[in-house]
């Protein structure tokens, strides 16, 4: 039901295909990447199958099967999962009303939204918000990543001292990205970084460009095998995309940023503080855009024993 209400059965539908694998012909991945980007930007409104097929430049008759083969989900289940995950983020991090969240996520009424949310997460939107965004159903919890396992035992005062937050304004940037699925298998992400670095080196844009990662998915609610991460490179110098890559445009935006140096546990703790410690006590709310992990030491971006990063959360003033 792409052009209407969310299908609350998305969890079952997600099992109707094998886990997604990169197609041998990269043009298939590029076209489906365009569809995913289009869907993420239009979750607030009905989107017809014909529209998505046109974005992908595939026959409407075959598009549904191609999408399922590449993504591991039906178009319906994928779209409705994105809507529910966006709703979960808004419930956790914004003060919007349930009605406003329902409309922002493509539901025609708060009652319809509440039914779909309960079917997806086994809790009501109100209960989810009151619990601080905790999913209590043990079956669902097994499917998602638990960031708490990675957090360092630091007091609130220690976090404030260790992770000072600054506001920065970044201009529009253009470049390329490689989208990786099932990113909790770290080798997949590292291979994508290696591919990106080798490519931009060959195009002579590596020294002056920016290497970063981002994800529009939420590890608190997205099943691990469906979690997507984009390995990105932007440059003021033009360069063409490699065969596994798609074009990227990051709009100008304000970010709350933390500079972090350390292992993956320190990175996870810094992200947790930025959102749960700083954001909810600030005069800002998150923009509907992914956070960035900018690699300050590009030469060693594939060495994941130690990170030098700017963690950047897109924000705007609370209204």
Q: Which residue stretches match the model-derived regions?
A:
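Amphipathic alpha-helical segments enriched in hydrophobic/aromatic residues interleaved with Lys/Arg
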Residues: 2-7
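A short, Lys/Arg-enriched amphipathic alpha-helix from helix-turn-helix/homeodomain DNA-binding modules
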Residues: 17-47, 80-96
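Conserved hydrophobic/aromatic pocket- or pore-lining residues that grip, position, or stack substrates
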Residues: 39, 63, 274
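A solvent-exposed interaction/effector surface
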Residues: 66-69, 77-78, 85, 89-92, ...
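Basic/polar phosphate-binding segments, predominantly the helix-turn-helix DNA-binding elements
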Residues: 8-23, 46-82, 102-124
């Amino acid at each position: 039901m792409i052009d209407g209400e969310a299908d609350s059965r998305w969890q079952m539908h997600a099992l109707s295909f094998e886990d997604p694998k990169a197609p041998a012909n990269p043009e298939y991945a590029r076209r489906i990447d365009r569809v995913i980007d289009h869907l993420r930007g239009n979750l607030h409104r009905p989107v017809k199958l014909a529209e998505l097929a046109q974005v992908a430049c595939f026959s409407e008759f075959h598009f549904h099967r191609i999408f399922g083969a590449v993504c591991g989900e039906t178009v319906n289940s994928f779209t409705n999962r994105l809507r529910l995950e966006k709703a979960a983020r808004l419930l956790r991090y914004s003060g919007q009303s349930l009605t406003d969240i329902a409309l922002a996520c493509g539901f025609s009424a708060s009652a319809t939204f509440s039914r779909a949310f309960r079917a997806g997460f086994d809790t009501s939107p109100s209960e989810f918000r009151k619990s601080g965004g905790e999913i209590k159903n043990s079956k669902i919890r097994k499917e998602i990543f638990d960031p708490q396992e990675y957090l360092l035992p630091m007091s609130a005062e220690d976090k404030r001292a260790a992770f000072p937050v600054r506001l920065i304004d970044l201009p529009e940037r253009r470049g390329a990205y490689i989208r990786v699925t099932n990113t909790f298998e770290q080798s997949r992400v590292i291979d994508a970084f290696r591919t990106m670095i080798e490519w931009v080196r060959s195009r002579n844009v590596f020294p002056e460009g920016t290497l970063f990662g981002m994800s529009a998915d939420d590890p608190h609610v997205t099943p691990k095998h469906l979690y997507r991460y984009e390995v990105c490179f932007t440059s003021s110098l033009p360069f063409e995309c490699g065969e596994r890559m798609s074009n990227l445009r990051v709009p100008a935006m304000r970010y709350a940023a933390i500079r972090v140096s350390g292992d993956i546990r320190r990175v996870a703790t810094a992200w947790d503080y930025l959102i749960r410690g700083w954001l909810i006590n600030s005069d800002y709310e998150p923009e509907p855009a992914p956070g960035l992990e900018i690699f300050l030491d590009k030469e060693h971006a594939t060495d994941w024993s130690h990170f030098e990063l700017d963690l950047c959360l897109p924000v705007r003033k609370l209204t």
